[in-house]
Amino acid sequence: MIQSHDLFGLELSHSFGFELGQSDTHSTHDMTHNSGDSLLQALHQSQNSLGQEYLMNDSGQVAPVVGHSSSSSHTTSTITQTHAAPAPTVVGTAGGFQIKLIWDSSVTGAPKGFMQAVIDAAQYYTSQFSNKEIININVGYGEIAGGQMSAGALGESESYGYLTNYATVTNELAKDGFTFAATNEPTQSQFFVTSAEAKTLGLVNASATALDGYVGFGTLSGTGYSWNLTANTTGQNSGTSPQQFDLQSVALHEISEVLGRIGMEGASVNNNATYTPLDLFNFKSPGTLALSPSSGYFSTDNGATNLGMFNDSASNGGDIADWASYQSPTQAGTQGLPAGFNVADAFAAFGYPGYNGDISTSDLEEMAALGYTLKVPVA
């Protein structure tokens, strides 16, 4: 479930999430494992065309749950708090793309600026996408989904979703102009689609109030590091010192996973090889999909153009769908990052203390490939 190669014990724990990595001098090395083959089976609580619903769980276990919570007044924390949970925050304009942040009671123990950093991360996405839907995300501090986070964890995410098939996924993405012509398309395999992405693709009710997922953020207590709580809505942060990690970057990363930025690359679910929509854009070479947890590259033109190298999770651990950054912050070669020594991609598999995690144009193209309509297309 979790791996850490950092001398200070810092790591990220999540179903699909952001990971801490090594410094410029390779003096620290934080890693976590993507338990992408873990699905927690759940009963579906609202009408949809996909049937039974599942929950991606960070523990790697598969078990049924008795229900799926509504997004209203949802507080799950088992951590003792002296205050009630803050009221939910709805980010975005009614009738457009919205994210409803349902604050867990644990957030009352977060430092000043924590909530605003998460809000600004959500606002970045609502400013970029024009899809008409509302995504409901529970936010915790030092916990996720009512459970303790691993010691030293930066962030975790868990996502509700559905098992469907290749034809359903590709038929919907084809409406956005994408074609699927690789020689090894997994046409007979099953696919996992997060609840949020299913809304985007028109497969479920876009205004459903049930939770789409959870994100949790570590306290960094006892690690010697702290959070940079500076935030803005541009997707390009600043001010992260050498002993800090960029909270807004982690929030951008974790929220994007709930939105569907995850990979499975054939992981077994119910004894069947399972993929995600993003796996259909992970290429080994022109015309050939990777279909493997080993490193491939992101491409939207059947592998002709490399828009960024994916993490080799088979060799390095970490998430399959994150950008390669085990060797350096810019290893993936993603496009459109602002210039600067201390700038890294927010979707990178391994983060670095002292680096601001920003959104690249490759990140935006990745989200567009999942069905999110950009208000301003990438040039």
Regions found by a protein language model. Give the residues of each.
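Extracellular zinc-dependent metalloprotease catalytic-domain scaffold
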Residues: I2-L252, E257-A379
